[in-house]
From Swiss-Prot:
Protein family per UniProt: Belongs to the EF-Ts family.
CC terms in the record's Gene Ontology section: cytoplasm
Protein name: Elongation factor Ts
Role noted for this protein: Associates with the EF-Tu.GDP complex and induces the exchange of GDP to GTP. It remains bound to the aminoacyl-tRNA.EF-Tu.GTP complex up to the GTP hydrolysis stage on the ribosome.
Domain of life assignment: Bacteria
PANTHER family the record matches: ELONGATION FACTOR TS, ELONGATION FACTOR TS, MITOCHONDRIAL
Length: 301
C-alpha cells in the first residue's frame, strides 16, 4: 500500500476543498491515487460540502461544558453562515455533543475533529460534513479550549439561547477555598462584560505593552512639558491602561470599589486561567451587495 503523506493529503485538499479527515480517508481507500480519490469523494457526496466550504461562516454559537466534578471545562465555537441556522435544533444538539467530545479530547480543533462523533457515526469532522449537506450552509469548528483546576472551573454564557450556548462564552479556573463555583461564575460574568486581554500584568503580550507605551509617550511629549514630568505622565497613563485590560487590575463590575484581584483574595481564591470567546471575533463577514443580490434573484426567477 502506498504511503499516505501529509503532502498527498494537502494536495488532494487543495484540488477538492475536502476536509483533512475526508481527504486522508479517500487516499487510503484508493491506495494514494489522486484521481481515484477525487472520484471517491464525488461518489460519497462530499463535493457538495466542499463547494460550500468557501462561503464565510461568521454566525453560529459558542458552547461551554463542565465535567461532572466541576474540575475541568471545555469551550467550543461552531460557526455557520446565518443566525437562523444557529437556532436550529439539529445544530444545537450537534454542538452540545461536540462540546462533550471537546471535554474528553486534548483541547485542540484537530483533536476534537478527529474524536468520535456524538451520534456514533464516524468522527466529529464527519458529523459537521453531514450537517453541511443536510442544512445547506457552510459550518466550521473554529476554535476549542480546555481548562482544568484542582479547585473549580466555572462557566458562563451571555444571553444564552439554550443552557450553555450563546454568542459569548467564558471559562474560569480557580483554586483555593470557599465557594469557588459562585466566585468563578461572578468573575466569568465580569470577563464577558469587560473582555480583558490577560489575567495579570505579567501575562500581557509584550508587543501590546510596547505599542501602548509608544503611543502614550508620543502623546505626552506633545504637551511640551519637562522630561521628568513626561515620565510621570507615562507611568500614570500606563497604570490606567492596565486597569482597562488586565483582569486582576480591573474594577469588579459587581463592586467597583475593589478590583477583581481583591475580590478573589477576599474569596480565598486564586485565578489559574480563563478563556473568553465572542462569536465571530476576528472573522470577516461578507458584505451584502444589493445589486448582486437582485441579479441573483432575477437569474433564478
Amino acid at each position: 500500500m502506498a504511503e499516505i503523506t501529509a503532502a498527498l493529503v494537502k494536495e488532494l485538499r487543495e484540488k477538492t476543498g475536502a476536509g483533512m479527515m475526508d481527504a486522508k480517508k479517500a487516499l487510503v481507500e484508493n491506495n494514494g491515487d489522486q484521481a481515484a480519490a477525487i472520484e471517491w469523494l464525488r461518489a460519497k457526496g462530499l463535493s457538495k460540502a466542499a463547494k460550500k466550504s468557501d462561503r464565510a461562516a461568521a454566525e453560529g454559537l459558542v458552547a461551554v461544558k463542565l465535567s461532572d466534578d466541576g474540575k475541568s471545562g471545555a469551550i467550543v465555537e461552531l460557526n455557520a453562515e446565518t443566525d437562523f441556522v444557529a437556532r436550529n435544533e439539529i445544530f444545537q444538539k450537534s454542538l452540545d455533543g461536540i462540546a462533550v467530545a471537546a471535554l474528553k479530547a486534548d483541547g485542540t480543533v484537530e483533536a476534537v475533529s478527529a474524536a468520535a462523533s456524538p451520534d456514533g457515526e464516524g468522527s466529529v469532522d464527519d458529523l459537521i460534513k453531514r450537517m453541511i449537506a443536510t442544512i445547506g450552509e457552510n459550518m466550521t469548528l473554529r476554535r476549542v479550549a480546555k481548562l482544568s483546576a484542582t479547585g473549580r472551573v466555572a462557566a458562563y454564557t451571555h444571553n444564552a439561547v439554550v443552557p450553555g450556548m450563546g454568542k459569548v462564552g467564558v471559562l474560569v479556573a480557580l483554586d483555593g477555598s470557599g465557594d469557588l463555583e459562585d466566585a468563578g461564575r461572578k468573575v466569568a460574568m465580569h470577563i464577558a462584560a469587560t473582555s480583558p486581554a490577560a489575567a495579570t500584568t505579567e501575562e500581557l503580550d509584550p508587543a501590546l505593552v510596547e505599542s501602548e507605551k509608544r503611543v502614550l509617550t508620543e502623546q505626552a511629549r506633545e504637551s511640551g512639558k519637562p522630561d521628568a514630568v513626561i515620565e510621570k505622565m507615562i507611568v500614570g497613563r500606563m497604570q490606567k491602561f492596565y486597569k482597562e485590560v488586565v483582569l486582576a487590575e480591573q474594577p469588579f463590575i459587581m463592586d467597583p470599589d475593589k478590583t477583581v484581584g481583591e475580590f478573589l483574595k477576599e474569596q480565598g481564591a486564586t485565578l489559574k486561567g480563563f478563556v473568553h470567546y465572542k462569536l465571530g471575533e476576528g472573522v470577516e463577514k461578507a458584505a451584502d451587495n444589493f445589486a448582486d443580490e437582485v441579479a441573483a434573484l432575477t437569474k433564478g426567477a
